[in-house]
Swiss-Prot record:
<keyword id="KW-0479">Metal-binding</keyword>
<dbReference type="InterPro" id="IPR001384">
    <property type="entry name" value="Peptidase_M35"/>
</dbReference>
<protein>
    <recommendedName>
        <fullName>Neutral protease 2 homolog ATEG_04941</fullName>
        <ecNumber>3.4.24.39</ecNumber>
    </recommendedName>
</protein>
<dbReference type="InterPro" id="IPR029463">
    <property type="entry name" value="Lys_MEP"/>
</dbReference>
<dbReference type="GO" id="GO:0006508">
    <property type="term" value="P:proteolysis"/>
</dbReference>
<feature type="disulfide bond">
    <location>
        <begin position="260"/>
        <end position="278"/>
    </location>
</feature>
<keyword id="KW-0732">Signal</keyword>
<keyword id="KW-0865">Zymogen</keyword>
<dbReference type="GO" id="GO:0046872">
    <property type="term" value="F:metal ion binding"/>
</dbReference>
<feature type="active site">
    <location>
        <position position="304"/>
    </location>
</feature>
<feature type="binding site">
    <location>
        <position position="307"/>
    </location>
    <ligand>
        <name>Zn(2+)</name>
    </ligand>
</feature>
<feature type="binding site">
    <location>
        <position position="318"/>
    </location>
    <ligand>
        <name>Zn(2+)</name>
    </ligand>
</feature>
<keyword id="KW-0964">Secreted</keyword>
<dbReference type="Pfam" id="PF02102">
    <property type="entry name" value="Peptidase_M35"/>
</dbReference>
<keyword id="KW-0378">Hydrolase</keyword>
<feature type="disulfide bond">
    <location>
        <begin position="181"/>
        <end position="253"/>
    </location>
</feature>
<dbReference type="InterPro" id="IPR024079">
    <property type="entry name" value="MetalloPept_cat_dom_sf"/>
</dbReference>
C-alpha cells in the first residue's frame, strides 16, 4: 500500500435481522422491482411488503446519491466489474438524511444509470439483480436489518449509447496540487494500519486452523477450502497494510473524491484500488474497540482493504452490515461480504 494520504488527490449492509419481529402478518421485508427505462437507465421500486413501518438506512442502497453498487450486472453468468464506490458508514448517530421510512405497502422509486458505474460499451445482453440485507434504525442507531431481493431483469444494451454515458468516478488529474497528511491524522492512520496487520494476521490463523464453531458462526461453513480462502484474504490484507511505500492500493487520510458525508467513515474505489478516510473516521471511531461487534479505526481499515481487488481478488461487496445481518448471510455471501471479515477479526481479537 502506498500511503499518500492527501488533502487533494493525484491518482487516476447492519445488525439484528431478528431484532425487528413482526407482530402480525408478513415478516419485515423489502421487495425490489427492477425495470428498464431507456437502454442503461434502470428504475428500482422498493416496497415494504411487511406489516409494520420500516426505517432503513439508504446508504449503499437505493436513494443513495453517491455512485454506490445498487445492483449486480452479469454477462453470460459472469459478473461485470463495478467502477463506483463502496462506503462504510457509522452505526450510531445517523443523521435524518441517511434514513428512509416506509409504511406497510408504501414504496419509493430510484432511477440510476448502470453505465455510469460499469463499462457497458460492449453492449449486448445484460442480466441485472440485487439481494442482501439493509440496515434498519431506531432513534438514529442501527438496531437490526431486513432482507431485500429483486426480480432478475434481462436487457439488451446499445453499445454506442452506453459508451456515451459519463463515468460517475474519474481518476483525479495528476497535476492536482499535493498536500500531505500530517499531524494527528497521520498518527491515527499509522496506528490503524499497524493494528490492521495484527488483527488480520490473527484472523488468518484463526480462519485456517482456529475454532471451527467461530468460523461457522461468521462464514456458515467449516469447509477446509473456504477456510483457506478466508485465511488467504486476511494474509493479503496484513501484507498490504504492512507497507506505506509499496503495494496495490493508495490510501488517503482525507476525502479524495468528495464522497464523504456526516455518516460515512471511509470509502473504497475498487476500480482504482483507492481508499479514503472521512472526517468521522477520526472523530467517531476509537483506534481499537474493546466491545464485541463494534466499529473502530482498525476494522474499518480492514473492511476497506477487503473491497480492493488489488489486495485480494475479487474484492468484497457490502451484502450484510453489522453482526446480525452478516451472520444471516449464506456461506457464499459471507465469503464476499466486507463486514464479515471485519467482524470475524474483531471476534478473534476479543474472543467474542
Amino acid at each position: 500500500m502506498r500511503f499518500t494520504a492527501l488533502a487533494t488527490a493525484i491518482l487516476p449492509l447492519a445488525c439484528n435481522v431478528l431484532a425487528l419481529p413482526a407482530k402480525t402478518g408478513e415478516a419485515p421485508k423489502l421487495d425490489v422491482s427492477l425495470s428498464q427505462v431507456d437502454n442503461t437507465l434502470i428504475k428500482a421500486v422498493v416496497k415494504n411488503t411487511g406489516s409494520e413501518d420500516i426505517t432503513f438506512v439508504h446508504l449503499n442502497f437505493f436513494r443513495d446519491k453517491a455512485p454506490v453498487k445498487k445492483v449486480s450486472l452479469f454477462r453470460n453468468a459472469t459478473e461485470l466489474p463495478f467502477q463506483g464506490i463502496k462506503q462504510r458508514f457509522r452505526t450510531e448517530g445517523l443523521t435524518e438524511d441517511a434514513l428512509t421510512v416506509l409504511a406497510p405497502g408504501e414504496s419509493i422509486e430510484d432511477e440510476f444509470d448502470i453505465a455510469a458505474t460499469s463499462d457497458l460499451s460492449e453492449g449486448g445482453s445484460i442480466t441485472i439483480s440485487t439481494d442482501g440485507f439493509v440496515p434498519i434504525a431506531t432513534g438514529n442507531k442501527i438496531t437490526g436489518s431486513v432482507p431485500y431481493s429483486s426480480n432478475e431483469l434481462s436487457i439488451e444494451v446499445d453499445a454506442a449509447q452506453a459508451a456515451s454515458v459519463a463515468s460517475a468516478v474519474k481518476p483525479l488529474d495528476k497535476r492536482t496540487k499535493v498536500a500531505s497528511c500530517s499531524g494527528t491524522r497521520s498518527s491515527a492512520l499509522s496506528t490503524a494500519l499497524k493494528n490492521t496487520v495484527s488483527l488480520a494476521n490473527a484472523a488468518a490463523s484463526a480462519a485456517q486452523s482456529g475454532s471451527s464453531s467461530r468460523f461457522q458462526e461468521y462464514f456458515k461453513t467449516t469447509s477446509s477450502s473456504v477456510r483457506s480462502t478466508v485465511a488467504a484474504r486476511f494474509r493479503a490484507v496484513a501484507s498490504e497494510a504492512s507497507s506505506t511505500s509499496s503495494g496495490s492500493t493508495t490510501y488517503y487520510c482525507t476525502d479524495t473524491y468528495g464522497y464523504c458525508s456526516s455518516n460515512v467513515l471511509a470509502y473504497t474505489l475498487p476500480a482504482y484500488n483507492i481508499i479514503a478516510n472521512c472526517d468521522i473516521y477520526y472523530t467517531y471511531l476509537s483506534a481499537l474497540t474493546r466491545t464485541c461487534h463494534a466499529q473502530d479505526q482498525a476494522t474499518t481499515t480492514l473492511h476497506e482493504f477487503t473491497h480492493a481487488p488489488g489486495v485480494y481478488s475479487p474484492g468484497t461487496d457490502d451484502l450484510g452490515y453489522g453482526y446480525d445481518a452478516a451472520t444471516a448471510l449464506s456461506s457464499s455471501q459471507a465469503l464476499n461480504n466486507a463486514d464479515t471479515y471485519a467482524l470475524f477479526a474483531n471476534a478473534v481479537n476479543l474472543n467474542c
